[in-house]
A protein has these predicted regions:
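Post-DEXD/H (motif II) to motif III coupling segment of the RecA-like Helicase ATP-binding lobe
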Residues: 116-168
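Conserved small/polar residues in nucleotide/adenosyl-binding loops
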Residues: 186-193
Length: 197
């Protein structure tokens, strides 16, 4: 069982439980690579130790569902005991009417997708359930916010702060103009590259 949180993850967990005393629906923002899934599993485990009896964790891709299932399992929670269900939003949308239990907590991984109608139904159908949205990007390209779904946002350190403290590696950002020669070279494998595959 892996229960060790980094100091910033522990701080985020404490801030979340304090925020839940005031709000039912909270979004947590942490940059990519800082352990959101590990934190998610620790939060779920602590929630189940308290008043919660059922948790649904919802993601938008099968690969994320598998990653979360593995992490939750490493934290000592198995899907066999029925208290934690990890599922894709597509599966939940098709099967929700056949599910007889109601969740005490709904966790949305990659919560920047939560404005989609398939997610909004979770707020309508399970208003008493606490909600936790986990994301690296608490904004959408269309400019819409999340205040109609999440009552509060808990933001972690910035990427620069994580790099400065040694938790993330520095990086170089390269922008390639669309339809440029560089873009075509990057997106089109050479005959030599295709022979190696």
């Amino acid at each position: 069982m892996n229960d060790t949180l980094r100091d910033y993850q522990q701080e985020m967990k404490l801030r979340l439980f304090k925020e839940w005393e005031l709000h039912r629906s909270v979004m947590v923002q942490m940059p990519t690579g800082t352990g959101k899934t590990h934190l998610l599993a620790a939060i779920v485990r602590e929630f189940l130790r308290g008043s919660g009896s059922r948790v649904w964790i919802v993601a938008h891709r099968r690969e994320l569902v598998e990653q979360i299932e593995e992490t939750v399992s490493r934290h000592g929670m198995s899907k066999e005991d029925g208290r934690v269900r990890v599922m894709s939003i597509q599966w939940l949308s098709r099967n929700r009417k056949h599910m007889d239990e109601e969740p005490d907590l709904i966790v949305i991984d990659e919560a920047h997708h939560a404005l989609a109608e398939t997610y909004r139904i979770l707020w309508e159908n399970y208003p008493e359930a606490r909600k936790l949205g986990m994301t690296a990007t608490p904004c959408r390209l269309n400019g819409k916010g999340f205040t109609d779904l999440f009552d509060s946002l808990i933001a972690s350190w910035t990427v620069a702060e994580f790099i400065g403290k040694g938790w993330l590696s520095s990086f170089d950002y390269v922008s390639i103009r669309a339809n440029s020669r560089d873009c075509l070279l990057y997106t089109s494998p050479s005959p030599r590259d295709t022979e190696r595959s």
